[in-house]
Amino acid sequence: MSICEKSLHWADKVAHKIIKERADCDQYTCASGITPSGTVHIGNFREIISVDLVVRALRDQGKSVRFVHSWDDYDVFRRIPDNVPAQDELKQYIRMPITSVPDPFQQEDSYARHHEREIESALPEVGIYPEYVYQSKQYQAGVYAQEIKIALDNRHRIQAILNEYRDEQHKISGTYWPVSVFCTACHKDCTTVDAWDSHWCLQYHCECGHGEQVDLRQTSAVKLSWRVDWAMRWSKEHVVFEPAGKDHHSQGGSFDTARLISDHIYHWPAPVSFRYDFIGLKGLPGKMSSSAGKVVGLRDVLEVYQPEVLRYLFVSTRPNTEFSISFDLDVLKIYEDYDKSERVAWGIHAAKSEHEFMRHKRIYELSQVRGMPPCISYQVPFRHVCNILQINSGDISAVLAFFSDIHKDQIERFVRRCQCAWNWIRDAGAPDDFKFTLKEDGVRVPLSAEITEALRLIRDTLVPRTDVLSEKELSAELYAVARQIPVGSKELFTALYQVLIGKNQGPRLAGFMKVIGTQRLHRMLSVY
């Protein structure tokens, strides 16, 4: 029995449910979808990676799977986000399709394409490769003409379905149309449908004064309303799984009504789904704060988290559980948790039970970007990596030289950890009291005669042996020196930190001195 068959991981459970309910499928289509109305934030990414994990679980069970990601770039441009330039210039495009709005960053063909490209270029870094479907192209090519006709022919039934979850005060009364129309003159959806001939032709008029009759087979102006569009796509793409946010899965929300429309109008059973919760952000640095108009996207998070560690955050948390992605000291804990899970998965750290081993192993498998690596990563705690980088002013080659026993299959992952650590230290959330710079300017710190004498003793007797003493041995020798002076160990160690980094405290002293090395320590203490 394979690990995915024995697994109790939520992605495997969902995959089992899909197979049970859709046993007759030759191919299992799983879908996600986002409107590129602005930066695709990390909360949107939860939908994409949730689908990816279920896709992987299905494939692990030998199923043929198609992963479709829809860009809803034919949605209307409703408002201008705060973090977008050329605000005044964009006002004229409000109420047009997003794909018709020019890119204010002047990098892509359209505003929509700019935001699509941002996430599309980042997803391969976390091992996600969906098939992209651009809804603007689908509508403009007339792909949905027949499905729009079906909706118009069944508009009264759709109206009844929508009203099923509404109270009397909010029921849709009067004439209802399950479509919106983009005027072919002003290109905005400020239109009113006047008539439908029950064949292919729709009559409308616009606030701009334009009006006309359009043939669904020849126009791209007509678009289905959201809940109808969603149901239609399930049928068109044969979708068997698609998650949705908690707002869509509320009682009587868009999923409930889309499910009925899919069943009764398009004759396709609604896909297996689940509700995913919101993502919080904790300890954001100033450059990423909402007050700075910044929306945190996937690339921002990958500045601090290795791809497999970022995946681990989502893999190890049930989708219906809210959690926060941290940029403060919790970053250290998250890396520690991932490292422990990796050690358990590779049998380096003994699990308490078979169940715990299987859980960690499956979480680790699903966290990997390209499947199981050939060997465990070179495990250096993130905190220690940060310290070594700061000692070497961010020089990753110097850090690699410090760990001479690293295997070639471990280098890529370790270098990425170093890059993330240095990003975090510089300007991505590390608190100031965690940061330091070695004092190698030759300027003396004012010290008492007793402390100065102790530093000289350390320089002359301990520093020459720093590279050969173990951390434990060096620590014992430091305490032995401290016992020889009347002020005690606390004052001596504070003085050492002041001399080395200009602060009253820092990394564990013995290990810190070993990383600095004999030559640099001797040079720094020689001014006393």
From Swiss-Prot:
Gene Ontology biological process terms from the UniProt entry: lysyl-tRNA aminoacylation
* Catalysed reactions listed for this entry: tRNA(Lys) + L-lysine + ATP = L-lysyl-tRNA(Lys) + AMP + diphosphate
Record's SUPFAM superfamilies?
An anticodon-binding domain of class I aminoacyl-tRNA synthetases (SSF48163), Nucleotidylyl transferase (SSF52374)
Its EC number(s): 6.1.1.6
Pfam families, alphabetized: tRNA-synt_1f
User: What cellular-component terms does GO give this entry?
Assistant: cytoplasm
Query: Into which EC class is this enzyme placed?
Result: ligase
The short sequence motif called 'KMSKS' region sits at 287-291
Keywords from UniProt, A to Z, are:
Aminoacyl-tRNA synthetase, ATP-binding, Cytoplasm, Ligase, Nucleotide-binding, Protein biosynthesis
Question: Is ATP-binding given among the entry's keywords?
Answer: yes
Q: Where's it found, cell-wise?
A: Cytoplasm
**Motif position, 'HIGH' region:** 36-44
Q: Where does the source fall among the domains of life?
A: Bacteria
UniProt key word Cell membrane? no
Q: Which Gene3D superfamilies match?
A: 1.10.10.350, 1.10.10.770, HUPs (3.40.50.620), Lysine tRNA ligase, stem contact fold domain (6.10.20.10)
Q: What is an example of a GO molecular function annotated in this UniProt entry?
A: tRNA binding
Query: Family assignment?
Result: Belongs to the class-I aminoacyl-tRNA synthetase family.
PANTHER family linked to this entry: LYSINE--TRNA LIGASE
- HAMAP family xrefs: Lys_tRNA_synth_class1 (MF_00177)
Q: What is this protein called?
A: Lysine--tRNA ligase
Organism for this UniProt entry: Treponema pallidum (strain Nichols)
| Lineage, opening ranks | Bacteria, Pseudomonadati, Spirochaetota, Spirochaetia, Spirochaetales
